[in-house]
Amino acid sequence: MLKWFIISCCLLTAISYSTYYLFTSNSWIKTVKTHTYSRFYQLIKENTKTQLDRLQEEAKLSGKSLIPPFINFDREYAIAPKYNISICRIKKSMSTLMSGVACVLYDTGKFMRNNRSILEVWSHRFCGEKNEYRRMNEVKWRMGDAHHTFKKIVVIRDPIARFISFFSNKCIFEAQKYPDRKQCYNCQGNVTCFLEKQYERFVQHSSDYSRIRPSYEDKHAAPLSWNCEFGKFLKDYKIIKLAVDPKDRKNGLANLMNVLKESNVPNSTLRFIEKSALEGETMHATYDSDAHDVVKKEIENDKKIREWLKRIYYLDFVIFDFDTTFINS
């Protein structure tokens, strides 16, 4: 009897110790947390995919198919390893400004000594290709030991505002300046003509068997979700919504400053970036031009144009949580 009592006590002690170790082990807790967070984000991803699939199916049934999201189409990264930051630049989404921000963070002293601007023309940008990469894998390699923890930042803007800026700059200003290029499919400033042709090109690009080369127009007009390898890394990004007009830029810029501050960017550098961004504008800014106002008014007054824009950009509104009131009007 005594023998069985001693054996039972030993077993209970062993079980108690094992249970205590299991629930207090940091590695075990870390594994559970990782699994829980991973599953949480997976559920969000699955729910979002279901919603996007449903919207696409409804549009298809109505004969107005939407351009699908998350095509791995265009990628431009500028990095600042000192602060473990990578900035993805999206064309016509303050890409010139963000290129300048990445550059001043890359080598602040040299940037300041040379009296450079974060808004300088793209072709004369100070850092050039010194801190620029085309693939996230290249960025991870360059980040070295920080490749698991570096911060991914991207600036986006309302898809319709972005389109108006693109069309005013590329399909009116540049098309008139360089007529021999027959830019924007030679539509001569006709918004409907351009959207019809661009929609068909995006349909081809989204095909698994597409062999057409991305054009200048494709890259500038592509849906937001086709950039930055969002299909793989969307949940990892710090997403900043930033308006182009300096009067409306303050809130988004404050968010950007907070994100940079989290990465220990000095206050003096933050003040320089904020002051430059609020007081200046890039060479390609169109928000206060006559062409911008004409295109904006045309979109507001023409339901057919809004329908084409919806077919191309509607899922951007959903994915990045922009107000859909206007696009649905």
Curated annotation (Swiss-Prot):
Subcellular localization(s) per the UniProt record: Golgi apparatus membrane
Free-text disruption phenotype from the record: The tm576 deletion mutant is lethal. The ok625 deletion mutant has reduced levels of 4-O-sulfated disaccharides, but increased levels of 6-O-sulfated disaccharides. Increased mortality in response to oxidative stress.
Residues that span the membrane, as ranges: 4-23
Tissue: Highly expressed in the head and tail of hermaphrodites, in particular in amphid and phasmid sheath cells.
GO cellular component: Golgi membrane
Membrane topology, Cytoplasmic segments: 1-3
Major subcellular site: Golgi
Pfam families: Sulfotransfer_2
Keyword ATP-binding listed: no
GO MF annotation list: chondroitin 4-sulfotransferase activity
Keywords, sorted A to Z: Carbohydrate metabolism, Golgi apparatus, Membrane, Signal-anchor, Transferase, Transmembrane, Transmembrane helix
InterPro entries registered for this protein in UniProt: Chst-1-like (IPR007669), Sulfotransferase (IPR005331)
Record topological domains on the Lumenal side: 24-329
Catalytic activity: chondroitin beta-D-glucuronate + n 3'-phosphoadenylyl sulfate = chondroitin 4'-sulfate + n adenosine 3',5'-bisphosphate + n H(+)
Residues that bind 3'-phosphoadenylyl sulfate: 91-97, 157-165
Topology in the lipid bilayer: Single-pass type II membrane protein
Family the entry assigns: Belongs to the sulfotransferase 2 family.
Name of the molecule in the record: Carbohydrate sulfotransferase chst-1
Native organism: Caenorhabditis elegans
